[in-house]
A protein has these predicted regions:
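Structured beta-strand/loop patches that form or line metal/cofactor-binding pockets in enzymes
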Residues: 1-42, 47, 53
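Metal- or metallocofactor-binding catalytic centers and their adjacent structured scaffolds
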Residues: 39-115
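Short, conserved phosphate-binding/catalytic loop or strand-edge motifs used
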Residues: 126-132
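Active-site mouth loops of central-metabolism enzymes
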Residues: 132-146
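Conserved small/polar residues in nucleotide/adenosyl-binding loops
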Residues: 166-171
Length: 173
């Protein structure tokens, strides 16, 4: 199987005002994200969204299409480790960062799962068949107090677990 094309379909969408306030502003407004598609000669297509739900992904589209796409065209999509090994060069010489590479990696794993007709977690060797739901958000606070308040609100909503995402300033506290 070989990669025949890589495209990004730009999706502009309105984020409704949910009333979630944060130190970083309110979560609402228009954002652009991309739907990354990696096509193969076998007719299998891998997908991944590009960009954060609030900040969008416009800044990631060109590096993916102009730097990573030429590296992948004609290659076997199972050669994920080959591209990981190229990241050092692509990072230092071409400015590729992990947030540019990550959607491509996810789409390649999506392809692998579809080609094997198996969920990705099984390809990775997982044996757990269920997991408890947890809450997570992009960083919404810059102070420890903000995170404590958010954790309390989530706990009162019934969540028992919370994936804490923070900025370096909040980590210092």
């Amino acid at each position: 199987m070989k990669i025949t094309n890589i495209t990004i379909e730009v999706i502009e969408r309105e984020i409704p005002d949910t009333g979630l306030d944060s130190d970083l502003g309110r979560f609402s407004g228009v954002t652009e994200q991309g739907l990354l598609r990696i096509n193969t000669d076998a007719g299998i297509e891998g997908h991944c969204f590009v960009g954060e739900f609030r900040r969008g992904g416009r800044s990631l589209f060109n590096p993916i299409l102009n730097v990573l796409k030429p590296e992948l065209m004609g290659r076997d999509p199972a050669d994920r480790e080959w591209l990981w090994n190229r990241l050092g060069v692509l990072s230092s010489r071409r400015g590729i960062t992990n947030n540019m590479w990550a959607p491509v990696d996810v789409a390649l794993w999506d392809l692998a799962g579809k080609a094997a007709n198996a969920p990705i977690y099984k390809l990775l060797g997982a044996q757990k068949y269920s997991t408890e739901v947890y809450a997570t958000y992009p960083p919404r606070h810059e102070t420890a107090e903000g995170f404590v308040k958010e954790a309390s609100e989530l706990m009162n909503s019934g969540f028992r677990s919370y994936c804490l995402l923070y900025t370096s300033d909040a980590a210092d506290e």
